């Protein structure tokens, strides 16, 4: 498999950690948010990697906690006229692409994703132009502009199936932006894939030496790994899968202990799925490495109660997701293909 860049060495300016709130302040904000959601005919669409209190709030107010594929489905089908997307910016853009008639708000427009940042539209478009014989498949963790350049958009939950399908048609692939997920998919399918070389700052921090030590401490534990992790970490896994697939695995596996190599935000829904099991965070390189926050995305952490309340109260340029209409229409094509393909998989 060819590679575009040899090393992933970008250091991103991470946001400051949100200020701590008292329990009284949190209760007041939750009440205010519930009132604002009703007043705005809004619903919260939250990702598994947001903080547990945000996921609980989404559930309590009739919203959704899900992976990026289910977030897209939920937002486009829900009758609310306003979507409050608790996640990172590409998730808000995806919601707007699929639901242009709705107001899409985010707690902050500064919640980034290293995969998105690591795949600028101009450079990626030039790369695609240099390989016109290849089908362009981009991960959901990309900007609207990059999606608009793609033939397909895909999430980790259906990546192997989609690439296997395209490979069966004899198509050669450009894959972007996650290098680890790309390598995993290529290994599973044998497809001819030319991969962009970005990575998730959280999953890139999981290390084999530390994971082996933890496996020795918990020899009966199952190891669950997200495929955005380095290949050597994936090789130590009992189960490799997307967020929703890892939650399902934790529920169905016979082991009572799970070592989980993904963002620790997933533990909220995973523990709901298997309350009797012991969930353990897989070790990372730790604070001081490229991931400041030890298996928790610092941009996901920006989706706090104060920021959600501010988004609903103010809206406007600080919170309102806007996508150029020409870009939106082009990006809608590969997104619709993804949703149709995923629906076909469900029917099989």
UniProtKB/Swiss-Prot annotation:
Its cofactor is [4Fe-4S] cluster. Keywords: 4Fe-4S, Cytoplasm, Iron, Iron-sulfur, Metal-binding, Pyridine nucleotide biosynthesis, Transferase. Its EC number is 2.5.1.72. The keyword Metal-binding applies. GO terms for cellular component: cytosol. Disulfide bonds: none annotated. It is found in: Cytoplasm. Its main location: cytoplasm. [4Fe-4S] cluster binds at residues 113, 200, 297. Binds 1 [4Fe-4S] cluster per subunit. GO terms for molecular function: 4 iron, 4 sulfur cluster binding; metal ion binding; quinolinate synthetase A activity. Catalyzes the condensation of iminoaspartate with dihydroxyacetone phosphate to form quinolinate. It catalyses: iminosuccinate + dihydroxyacetone phosphate = quinolinate + phosphate + 2 H2O + H(+). Pathway: Cofactor biosynthesis; NAD(+) biosynthesis; quinolinate from iminoaspartate: step 1/1. This is Quinolinate synthase. NCBIfam families: nadA, PRK09375.1-1, PRK09375.1-2. One of its GO terms (biological process) is 'de novo' NAD biosynthetic process from L-aspartate. It is an enzyme of class 2 (transferase). Iminosuccinate binds at residues 47, 68, 139-141, 156, 226-228, 243. Signal peptide: none annotated. The keyword Transmembrane does not apply. Belongs to the quinolinate synthase family. Type 1 subfamily.
């Amino acid at each position: 498999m060819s590679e575009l860049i040899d090393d992933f060495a970008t250091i991103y300016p991470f946001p400051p950690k949100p200020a701590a709130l008292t329990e009284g302040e949190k209760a007041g904000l939750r009440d205010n948010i519930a009132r604002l959601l009703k007043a705005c005919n809004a619903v919260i669409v939250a990702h598994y990697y947001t903080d547990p209190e945000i996921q609980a709030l989404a559930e309590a107010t009739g919203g959704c906690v899900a992976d990026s594929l289910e977030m897209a489905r939920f937002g486009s089908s829900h009758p609310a006229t306003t979507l409050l997307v608790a996640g990172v910016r590409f998730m808000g853009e995806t919601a707007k692409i699929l639901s242009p008639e709705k107001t899409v708000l985010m707690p902050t427009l500064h919640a980034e994703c290293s995969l998105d940042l690591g795949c600028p539209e101009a450079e990626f478009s030039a790369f695609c132009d240099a390989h016109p014989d290849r089908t362009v498949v981009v991960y959901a963790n990309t900007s609207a502009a990059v999606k608009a350049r793609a033939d397909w958009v895909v999430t980790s939950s259906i990546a192997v199936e989609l690439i296997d399908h395209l490979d069966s048609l004899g198509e050669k692939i450009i894959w972007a932006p996650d290098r680890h997920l790309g390598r995993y998919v290529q290994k599973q399918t044998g497809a001819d894939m030319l991969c962009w070389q970005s990575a998730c700052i959280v999953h890139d921090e999981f290390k084999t030496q530390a994971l082996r030590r933890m496996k020795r401490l918990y020899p009966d534990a199952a190891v669950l790994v997200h495929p955005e992790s380095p290949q050597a970490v994936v090789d130590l896994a009992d189960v490799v899968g997307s967020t929703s697939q890892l939650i399902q695995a934790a529920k169905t596996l016979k082991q009572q202990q799970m070592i989980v190599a993904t963002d620790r935000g997933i533990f909220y829904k995973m523990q709901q799925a298997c309350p009797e099991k012991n969930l353990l965070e897989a070790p990372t390189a730790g604070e001081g490495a490229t991931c400041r926050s030890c298996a928790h995305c610092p941009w996901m952490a920006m989706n706090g109660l104060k920021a959600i309340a501010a988004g609903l109260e103010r809206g406007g340029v600080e919170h309102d997701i806007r996508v150029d209409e020409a870009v939106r229409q082009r990006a809608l094509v590969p997104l619709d293909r993804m949703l149709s393909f995923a629906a076909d998989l469900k029917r099989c």
